[in-house]
């Protein structure tokens, strides 16, 4: 394993990296950083959670001239959440060197962003639409940019941003370095690379490694009407510390979050219709453990970098292998083991096999748990709580009362009563969920078309106006 010390980084960057607690590089960092420092174009096939932000962030910070007040690097990201998280990490990497980093994205007051742009940031991290808005207004100038990063390019393709990316790149100097990161490499992404990159070096994560070996992957074949009861039984048995439940639609996310709360779970939903303030509030509560279950759509969860997620539940099967890779990549991080469970209706088995073929990874079939098994799971949790109190708490104040109880009742009956009080019995409160139609097996789309369900609905196709 390569250490950052071996990469010949500046003292300023090394000090920042040490503050962040980094010592050894990840594979994507070990391969990408030296190439980037040599000003070579790089295509990195890597998903979120592999350390790719530092892989492009460290070279960017190294190459920024802080005495030059112009924008020198541009990172394009598909979502607001990813733009914020990337900018936060770049800020940490550049803190000692005093590199100014600014995120710009839709949903935030544009006048506030204009004021921030006047403070001369060195690095811009933004979503395609908002970057174009600022270029059109003349508030963002890119003529001094020497590095462009396209982060999660496949997701920008799925969201219909390819034309926007092409327009942005046409306003960046031809003499630049371009770094492109993508979990998958569909043809439109390859064409972007051919058109806008100069003899790029490919740093590739093999397909068999794409879904991360330390994630246990299971599927459950279950009818639509029974999915919610099965989900709550799994939650009772597995008792995840932090879990993400994925739904296919915004309506599904809202209904699932409400239904989970109705049954006594601390859950909140996140999707594109929420205000930015609400989304950030939900994410903060999830990171702090105030809620134990985050219910999310694919788009809302893109790029989320939340440590400690132990379980991912695909309540609705993902529409394509790329989404599956992104979803389960929320867990199994930093060397820890994660668990991914995918619910499949009988008519969606073909889609499951399509995902398995593409990721080159078989999911293990799991039998849907029964109500009795859910109760046993909660009993195990109650026993663990009881034993923890026995081992760690001072019980002397309670022992006299315990002795009096034992004079009147046998010990087994008393312990059973304690367990009953501590056990959260499975809740069968009726809930109402709108049924989602089964997902058909994804077919290869015709050249030039868009992936199923990914037509540009959020933004119209926009061109940059000349100045």
Curated annotation (Swiss-Prot):
Keyword match Calcium: no
GO CC terms in record: bacterial nucleoid; cytosol; ribosome
EC number: 3.6.4.13
Stretches with biased composition (Basic residues): 457-467
Motif (DEAD box): 151-154
Keywords per UniProt: ATP-binding, Cytoplasm, Helicase, Hydrolase, Nucleotide-binding, RNA-binding, Stress response
Catalytic activity: ATP + H2O = ADP + phosphate + H(+)
Positions of transmembrane segments: none
Location in the cell: Cytoplasm
GO biological process, one term: response to cold
Spans annotated as Disordered: 428-467
InterPro entries: DEAD/DEAH_box_helicase_dom, DEAD_box_RNA_helicases, DEAD_helicase_CshA, Helicase_ATP-bd, Helicase_C-like, P-loop_NTPase, RNA-helicase_DEAD-box_CS, RNA_helicase_DEAD_Q_motif
Presence of the UniProt keyword Protein biosynthesis in the record: no
Superkingdom of origin organism: Bacteria
Binding site for ATP: 46-53
Task of the protein: DEAD-box RNA helicase possibly involved in RNA degradation. Unwinds dsRNA in both 5'- and 3'-directions, has RNA-dependent ATPase activity.
Family the entry assigns: Belongs to the DEAD box helicase family. CshA subfamily.
Protein name in the entry: DEAD-box ATP-dependent RNA helicase CshA
Gene that this sequence comes from: cshA
């Amino acid at each position: 394993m390569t250490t950052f010390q071996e990469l010949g980084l500046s003292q300023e960057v090394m000090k920042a990296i040490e503050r962040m607690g980094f010592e050894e590089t990840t594979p994507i960092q070990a391969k990408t950083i030296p190439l980037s420092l040599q000003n070579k174009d790089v295509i990195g096939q890597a998903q979120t959670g592999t350390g790719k932000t530092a892989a492009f962030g460290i070279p960017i910070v190294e190459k920024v001239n802080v005495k030059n007040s112009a924008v020198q690097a541009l990172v394009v990201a598909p979502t607001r959440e990813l733009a914020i998280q990337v900018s936060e990490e770049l800020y940490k990497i550049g803190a000692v060197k005093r590199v100014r980093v600014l995120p710009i994205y839709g949903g935030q007051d544009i006048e506030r962003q204009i004021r921030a742009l006047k403070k001369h940031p060195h690095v811009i991290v933004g979503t395609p639409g908002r970057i174009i808005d600022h270029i059109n207004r003349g508030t963002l100038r890119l003529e001094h940019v020497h590095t462009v990063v396209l982060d999660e390019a496949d997701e920008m393709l799925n969201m219909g941003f390819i034309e926007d990316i092409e327009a942005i790149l046409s306003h960046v100097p031809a003499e630049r370095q371009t770094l492109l990161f993508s979990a998958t490499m569909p043809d439109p992404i390859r064409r972007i690379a051919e058109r806008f990159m100069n003899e790029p070096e490919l740093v590739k994560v093999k397909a068999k490694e794409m879904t991360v070996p330390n994630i246990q992957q299971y599927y459950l074949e279950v009818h639509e009407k029974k999915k919610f009861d099965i989900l709550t039984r799994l939650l009772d048995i597995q008792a995840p510390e932090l879990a993400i439940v994925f739904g296919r639609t915004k309506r599904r996310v809202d209904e699932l979050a409400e239904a989970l709360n109705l049954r006594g779970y601390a859950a909140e939903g996140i999707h594109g219709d929420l205000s930015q303030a609400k989304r950030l509030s939900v994410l903060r509560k999830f990171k702090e453990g105030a809620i134990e279950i985050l219910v999310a759509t694919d788009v809302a969860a893109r790029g989320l970098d939340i440590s400690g997620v132990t379980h991912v539940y695909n309540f609705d099967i993902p529409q394509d292998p790329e989404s599956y890779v992104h979803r389960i990549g929320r867990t199994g991080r930093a060397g820890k083991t994660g668990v991914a469970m995918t619910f499949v209706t009988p008519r969606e088995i073909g889609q499951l096999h399509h995902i398995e073929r593409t990721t080159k990874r078989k999911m293990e079939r799991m039998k849907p748990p029964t109500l009795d098994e859910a109760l046993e799971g909660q009993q195990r949790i109650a026993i663990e709580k009881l034993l923890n109190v026995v081992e760690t708490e001072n019980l002397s104040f309670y022992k006299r009362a315990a002795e009096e109880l034992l004079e009147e009742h046998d010990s087994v009956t008393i312990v059973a009563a304690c367990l009953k009080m501590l056990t959260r019995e499975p809740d069968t409160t009726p809930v109402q969920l709108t049924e989602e139609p089964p997902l058909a097996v994804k077919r290869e789309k015709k050249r030039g078309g868009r992936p199923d369900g990914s037509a540009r609905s959020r933004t119209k196709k926009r061109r940059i106006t000349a100045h």
